[in-house]
A protein has these predicted regions:
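Generic intrinsically disordered, low-complexity segments enriched for polar/acidic and small residues
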Residues: 9, 19, 43, 130-131, ...
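Extended low-complexity acidic/polar segments
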Residues: 123-143
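Conserved non-transmembrane functional hotspots
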Residues: 136-493
Length: 493
């Protein structure tokens, strides 16, 4: 049906042969016999298919007459579910009601208006066959022929990530496959290997742009210190009038460097790619452990980053795309394997080596604490030296040489400048906040390890791993929000 000739029908069959085909599980209570004929059982199966398609697509294509309908699994209900996450008779009303009042980047529908070959099959009032437009939940513009700006930006971010992966493909291949470090991991099902591969790309790119951002910060604050020093010499020391030109040259260099960093979007890419990598890490280990979402047919991380900027929806879209696939068959001794996940993801705080997130967060916390102590010590040192210099000037007053007095005055200007620059640099990197976050995450993983040690069976272990993953995703969302509030700036210069 739907084809005007055998040639079109054959073309469709050839196209269908290129697709990956997999079966969704039967809805609870359904059998193959009960869905063989039209009826409530088959409608529930269609509703499940609708939920799966909606949960794993970036843009829902709806060939629809625009008329509302209460038929379960029908196009009208699929569109409604995609925009509200509510499907009467299937999803609980309160569980997803918050989708109705939040910016939800997965609500976009592209409708092609069509009629039905039956009496009364014309499109809804005001619509004509073959019209096409985007449907959104925006009450001010529910229909638009142009892709809304927020979604355009979101898809642009996806394209930029794909371009970066292609650009650095050779280096990515040479990077360490952190999720596939042993023979057991390489025996995992293909879908999990695909997630590990995407993680490898996102992790490499995040580290690549992190180096650029941190280099940019160090250079910027070094320039700020040098500019301050140049101005002090220009203003307070005779014979250094040319320092004003040094000041301007340093400022110009910093401005050019800042313009390059902003144009190439270094910080945004570093933050986005790091959060994508950490989301994929959770997704990978959940699947290896056999942890499924509470409604396994839906996308497991549908709330990840939902409270942040809609622009960040591209991260969830990437995770959504790589999660598409059939339910994997168990591989004895390999998959599902909660024990493997506990060892590789969580790790052991008492074991040697660097395996697991417990050891990672401990190392990061110790490193940030040392940096914080250095910043505090520098501030105190500068304070006391400044007080000492002030006392010397006050006590000796006119009894010291003019050249010595000039040096002391310069020192009084340089010391607080150095302390201020170091403090600003630490604030920009959010060192204090990260110490607290790393301490929290380290305790979180240690507590999870303790709970897993007394779990009675794999089901209890999966419950703990699910809770741990959800908490980790929440913390990653807080991390990106914290750093987005500290953008690269030229104002310090």
């Amino acid at each position: 049906a739907g084809f005007c000739c055998d040639e079109q029908r054959q073309g469709f069959r050839e196209f269908a042969q290129q697709a990956d085909v997999f079966e969704l599980p039967l809805v609870a209570g359904n059998t193959r016999e009960s869905i063989a004929e039209p009826g409530p059982a088959r409608d529930k199966q269609y509703a499940q298919l609708a939920m799966y398609l909606s949960g794993h697509c970036h843009l829902l294509l709806a060939l629809w007459d625009g008329k509302p309908s209460e038929l379960m699994g029908g196009t009208a209900q699929v569109v409604r579910y995609h925009q509200t996450d509510l499907l009467p008779g299937v999803t609980p009303g309160r569980k997803r009601a918050r989708q109705l009042i939040t910016d939800y980047e997965s609500d976009l529908v592209y409708q092609v208006v069509c009629s039905r070959d039956r009496p009364g099959g014309e499109p809804a009032s005001g619509l004509q066959s073959l019209q096409s437009f985007y449907l959104t939940t925006n009450p001010d513009q529910p229909r638009t022929e142009q892709l809304p700006l927020a979604y355009r930006l979101m898809f642009r971010r996806t394209c930029e990530f794909n371009r970066d992966v292609a650009k650095y493909a050779a280096k990515i291949v040479k990077s360490e496959p952190k999720l596939l470090r042993d023979a057991v991991a390489h025996r995992l099902p293909d879908r999990l290997l695909g997630i590990a591969s995407l993680f490898r790309s996102a992790d490499f790119l995040a580290r690549h742009f992190q180096v650029r951002v941190h280099t940019m910060l160090r250079v910027t604050y070094t320039l700020a210190a040098l500019m301050g020093l140049a101005f002090i010499f220009y203003a307070d020391v005779a014979g250094f009038g040319y320092m004003i030109y040094v000041f301007l040259a340093l400022f110009a260099f910093g401005a050019v460097l800042y313009a390059i960093a902003v144009k190439r979007d270094w910080q945004r890419k570093y933050l986005d790619y790091r959060v994508l990598a950490e989301g994929l890490r959770v997704q990978f280990f959940w699947l290896v452990a056999g942890v499924s979402s509470r409604m396994s047919i839906q996308f497991a991380h549908d709330n990840f980053l939902q409270k942040q900027d809609v622009e960040l929806g591209w991260i969830r879209n990437a995770m959504r795309a790589v999660s598409v696939g059939p339910q994997e068959e168990p591989v004895p001794g390999v998959f599902p394997n909660p024990t493997y996940v506990i060892e590789r993801w969580i790790g052991d705080p008492d074991a040697s080596g660097n395996r697991g997130q417990i050891r990672y967060f401990q190392r990061q916390m110790d490193q940030k604490w040392r940096y914080h102590q250095m910043t505090t010590a520098l501030a105190r040192l500068c304070l006391w030296i400044g007080i000492a210099v002030t006392l010397v000037l006050a006590v000796l007053d006119n009894r010291i040489a003019e050249s010595t007095e000039s040096v002391l005055l310069v020192l009084m200007g340089v010391l607080p400048l150095a302390a201020a620059v170091r403090e600003a640099y630490a604030h920009k990197k959010a060192d204090r906040e990260l110490i607290k976050q790393y301490r929290f995450m380290q305790r979180l993983f240690c507590n999870a390890r303790a709970q897993l040690a007394v779990a009675r069976d794999d089901d209890e272990r999966r419950d703990v791993l699910r809770a741990l993953g959800e908490a980790a995703l929440d913390e990653h969302a807080e991390w990106i929000l914290m750093h987005r509030e500290r953008p690269l700036e030229h104002s310090w210069l």
